[in-house]
Amino acid sequence: MRIALLTESAFPTARSVEGGWCDRLTRGLPEHEFELYALGATRRDPMPEPRPARLAALHHSGGTGGLSGLPAGGRFGGGLHGPRRRRALAAYRALVGALVQPAGADGFGPALYALADAGRGGGLPALLRSGAALDIVEAAWRTPGARGTVGPGSVGEPLVRDALVAVDLLERCLRPLSAPWYGPDALAAADVCHAVDGGLAVLPGLLAKHDHGTPLIITEHSLHLRERARGYRDAPYRWPVRALLLAFFRLLAREGYQQAGLITPGSAYDRRWQIHCGADPAAIRVVYEGTEVADRPGAGAEPPVPTLAWSGPIAPHGGLGTMLRAFADLRRELPEAVLRIHGEAPAGAGGYAERCRELAALIAPKDPDAVVFEDPSAEPGAVHRQAGVVVFCGTGGTAPRVLAEAMLSGRPVVATDVGAAREVVGPTGLLVPAEDPRALTAACAALLGDQERRSRLGNAGRLRAQELYAVEPAATAFRALYLELVSGWPGPDPVRQAGAAPAARQPFGRPADYWVAAGSRQARARDSVPVEAGAG
């Protein structure tokens, strides 16, 4: 089969998280042909080195700006005029209405496809940044009951600058509609579209399914909608803008879940979130993210002194403050204990990181080696080898793969009972409530004071992670899922090259459901009318 991998990022390398997953998938399924479509890549970007294995082709999004800069030239240039412009503005008006009106959510999908259809041939990004688009957003916010315009005082009152920001951000979100991927030699020729980690990467898959009937599978190792919602907590936008963008990603996720033939979350915890967001439980298959660390040896002998290794982002949701308070109490029981901190401060968290360093210096002022801040670029495995217990105490939940790689070191894990931690760690580690320094102190002291228990839990955790997160079971699962998806899907129409003779009919070349669905496809083509196509 020809598999189109869709990603929101730039071209991933084989060493990056996303590229590493693509590399493992393509190596594990040598019988298939894979092509990578990267929304964040432009024609100026160099090919990744090392590139993921067995990728037949890598496709950029066109222009020079990808998803992060202004497009220029190619399909992005030009303008929309006459009936196409009126159709595009009518579709955009319906799309924005679906975002701001709670009762209009069902109109999101039809408006999205109508907008993409009206923008064929170029000019859509320029129109979506125009004054006409600005007028549509401002008018939508003025309608009674518009989402995001209700709040205490002036919190929900949209300003002109809010409309300017919203139009710009929404245009960037809709830029995949103009990617040069929808011709007969690209997504139309794929047997399956596989969107990696959801989000905007789903948009090309939705259009390929809508236009060509290409089946879609969505893989989310961390729920994209949930991460977006967390990210917008500290975003520098006022409430009307945040509400509009969150509504877009929520409705995009719902449309993707409803149109996908199969959905593969990385944990049962994410599966529950997906069902809550509109996914059909029958379409969901949990596939744990494989990691090559499963084939490597464990960490070996423990350090001579009782040592904890903390991992996570040095930010309020990472839990380092809780860890330091717990470690201060632990030092009263184990004065020789050492804490090794491995993480870096994300953008905007520099002040928090500095306060954590000041607090760490107060824990043992006469012993500067009691708390060690590791180089953020150090390999996690190297940090695990220097500890007897690995601790994750963030409030936002640690990625299952990160927990699994810590367990694969053979060290016992202490983690806060949030997210997928209970599912991943199971009975092989200790779970504590979030933001509870006393419980964290007790768990760490219990393990550091019992070498036999540390060894038993560490070995059990390694075996559990090897069973769940080995590479081969993940590849085997996708081999079966691709076959399951294609076997139950009507085949696409054959792509005919210009000037070529019609292909001869192949007996039994298509399943019976293709011919049954052909009539309904023709009926939909006759009945489909673009939103307000005759307006103006």
Regions from the PLM with identified roles:
Residues 1-152, 489-536:
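N-terminal subdomain of nucleotide-sugar transferases
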Residues 430-437, 446-452:
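Conserved acidic donor-binding segment of nucleotide-sugar-dependent glycosyltransferases
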Residues 412-415:
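Short hydrophobic beta-strand element within catalytic cores of glycosyltransferases
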Residues 395:
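Aromatic "clamp/platform" in nucleotide-sugar-dependent glycosyltransferases that forms part
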Residues 353-377:
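Nucleotide-activated donor-binding/catalytic signature segment of Leloir-type glycosyltransferases, i.e.
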Residues 142, 147-153, 157-176, 243-297:
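Donor nucleotide-sugar binding/catalytic pocket of nucleotide-sugar-dependent glycosyltransferases
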Residues 439, 453-468, 474-483, 494-497:
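A short, well-ordered alpha-helix in the C-terminal region of glycosyltransferases
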Residues 293-331, 340-342:
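Conserved donor-binding/catalytic core segment of Leloir-type glycosyltransferases
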